[in-house]
Amino acid sequence: MKGDTKVINYLNKLLGNELVAINQYFLHARMFKNWGLKRLNDVEYHESIDEMKHADRYIERILFLEGLPNLQDLGKLNIGEDVEEMLRSDLALELDGAKNLREAIGYADSVHDYVSRDMMIEILRDEEGHIDWLETELDLIQKMGLQNYLQAQIREEG
C-alpha cells in the first residue's frame, strides 16, 4: 500500500531515534554492569531491547507503506562518563524522541493514517514511561546523594 511520503519520512526519522537509543542504552547498560551496578544494567539493557522492538515496528510499517527504511543516517550517541551524566543523556534522547513522536502523530492524524498514528501513540506511551523512570532516578540522586543512590543500584532489578 502506497503511503504518504511525509508519514514515511517521519517514520524514518523516528527509526533513526530508535537506532541511536538502542546503541546508547546498550553501551550504558554494559558500562553499568562493568561498574557493578546491576539494577541500572538490567533496566538499561531492557530499555535497549524495547527500543529494538520499536525500531522493528517502524521498519515493518515503512515497508508496508512501500517506503525504504533508512538504517544508515544515525544520529550522535551521547555516552556519559558517570551515572548521572548517563541518565541525563538518556533523558535528553527520550525527550527529543517524544517531541518528534508527537509531531509525527499529529501529521499522521491529519492525513488519516490512523494505523501509523495508533502505532506511534503506543510507542509514545512506552517512551513516556522511560522518561518518568529517568526523571525519578535523577530526582533520587538529588534527594539521596550520589553515593547512597549508587549503593542502591548494586542489587538486581525485580
UniProtKB/Swiss-Prot annotation:
Q: Where is the Ferritin-like diiron domain?
A: 1-145
Variant or mutagenesis effect after changing R57K: In strain: ECOR 30
Cofactor remark from the record: Binds 1 heme b (iron(II)-protoporphyrin IX) group per dimer.
Binding sites annotated in the UniProt record for Fe cation 1: E18, E51, H54, E127
Task: List residues binding heme b.
Answer: M52
Outcome, altering H46A: Fe(2+)-binding and single turnover oxidation at the ferroxidase center occur normally but iron mineralization within the cavity is significantly impaired
Impact of mutating D96E? In strain: ECOR 30
Q: What is its EC number?
A: 1.16.3.1
- Catalysis performed (reactions): 4 Fe(2+) + O2 + 4 H(+) = 4 Fe(3+) + 2 H2O; Fe(2+)(in) = Fe(2+)(out)
Q: Which GO terms describe its molecular function?
A: ferric iron binding; ferroxidase activity; heme binding; identical protein binding; iron ion binding; iron ion sequestering activity; oxidoreductase activity; protein homodimerization activity
Free-text activity regulation comment from the record: Iron oxidation is inhibited by Zn(2+), which binds at the ferroxidase center with a higher affinity that Fe(2+). The occupation of the ferroxidase center by Zn(2+) also severely restricts the ability of BFR to form an iron core.
Where do the coiled-coil regions begin and end?
Answer: none
GO annotation, biological process: intracellular iron ion homeostasis; iron ion transport
Q: What outcome is documented for mutating N100D in this protein? A: In strain: ECOR 30
**Which NCBIfam families does this one have?**
bfr
- Quote the record's miscellaneous comment: The internal surface iron site that binds iron 3 is important for the mineralization phase but not for Fe(2+) binding and oxidation at the ferroxidase center.
Q: How does it assemble?
A: Homooligomer of 24 subunits, arranged as 12 dimers, that are packed together to form an approximately spherical molecule with a central cavity, in which large amounts of iron can be deposited as a ferric-oxy-hydroxide mineral core.
Q: Which PANTHER family match?
A: BACTERIOFERRITIN
Listed name of the protein = Bacterioferritin
Supply the source organism for this entry. Escherichia coli (strain K12)
Classification of source organism: Bacteria, Pseudomonadati, Pseudomonadota, Gammaproteobacteria, Enterobacterales
